[in-house]
Amino acid sequence: MTETGTTESGGTPRARLARRYLEVNGEHPMTEADDAYVDRQFAPLEPLCARHGRDPDEVRGHMLDGRLPLPGYLRSDGTEMVAPDLLELVDEAGGLAKLPDWFRGHWADREEGEEEYESYLSGQNVCLHRLHPVTMRRKAELVRGITEALDRPADGPSGRLPELPALHAMVDELDALEPQFTAYDRLRFGGPVSRDTCIDAVRRDHPLD
């Protein structure tokens, strides 16, 4: 570390984290509407660290080293936006060292648990109001259930899907778990998000009435 707070590997922790974020998410502009959405759903990293008595650069270092998730978003002014309960999850796990095994242990299938943990660390899991292994697992179950229901043959000439009330119950539960997403998400993910395909499209194309 130099006297200016930079490192020989390429600038301040904040600058290096911004570069890593863009490597993962690509370079897509954040509009005023995107910023406003993110302000409602996420928390700026530095004030969050202050509330928890954490050093922001230390937290950034953990993100860069793959011990904590990357920010979910960078606002247009460069502010790192993270899940409001980012550090609470670490406390629930019993500390940063215990987080990986605690997190993976929520899945019976070890490989699936590892995949979900890597997804968590990417910072791209912005699809839940509360980012937690329990809600991640439930979302995956609901998306699978909805997809399977949509793949079933329709009932006769009516064109209605079988067990439509059960399908809508899953859609309603998923709706409660997920935020609205923003236009930026559809750019970085390259198309529709799960809210588009598993909530809005189902309600539009397969209404109960």
Regions found by a protein language model. Name each.
Residues 5-24, 30, 71-209:
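Long, charge-rich, low-complexity intrinsically disordered regions
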Residues 28-40:
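Short, amphipathic alpha-helical "recognition" segments used to contact nucleic acids or chromatin
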Residues 37-59:
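Polyanion-binding surface elements
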Residues 63:
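DNA major-groove recognition helix of helix-turn-helix
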Residues 66-67:
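The DNA-recognition helices of helix-turn-helix-type DNA-binding domains
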